[in-house]
Every structure is written in structure tokens, then in C-alpha cells.
Amino acid sequence: MVSGLAPVKRGEVYWVNLDPTIGTEIKKTRPALVVSPDDMNAALPRVIVAPITSKGQALGCRPELVFNGQPARVLLDQIRCVDKARLVKKMGDIDPTLWHDTLLQMLG
């Protein structure tokens, strides 16, 4: 769990423990992008994340980008709310211009 560090911010990427899961939910500890707004992240013990993978089917709801020098897809179809205790370690940030419009289209 990430503790004693700066507040969690939208656009940051963390290693997140997603287990246990059910059915086709994405499993294991993997990178995930924080998509929840900063006011929510500061006020609540939970954040909304979208897992990141280097595999999987290319879909319009899965923006493709490069993260830490590797091709990646943000799985906006697998968004979930997780307790901050599931956040293992901060990995970096992803510019919102690479994913935010797709998120708005999905939710709009």
C-alpha cells in the first residue's frame, strides 16, 4: 500500500493489486491509471482506476500509447473503484490528452 506519500492524482499510474476477481475481470497486480478526479482522490479512501496492459484486443475504448518505453493499452472497459490499500507503488504519469477524450466518450 502506498502510504506517507503525496496524494494520489488523476493521470498517475500505480502498480495495483486487482485480486481477487470474478469471471473476466482483469487479474493480478498490474499497472493502472488513476481516472478519478483529484477532489475525490483527496477526500475518499478509494480511487477509480483503469488497468493497463501490453496485450489484449484493440478497441476504441482502449487508448493505445507508450508508457515507460513500452506499447500499452489503457483498458477503459475494465474501470473499477479500488481502496487505496490496493495501490502498491507509483510508476509514473500519463498525459490526459492521450486518454481523457476516450473516457468522456464512453461515459457521455
Predicted regions and their residues:
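Conserved functional hotspots at enzyme active or ligand-binding sites that engage polyanionic ligands
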Residues: 1-108
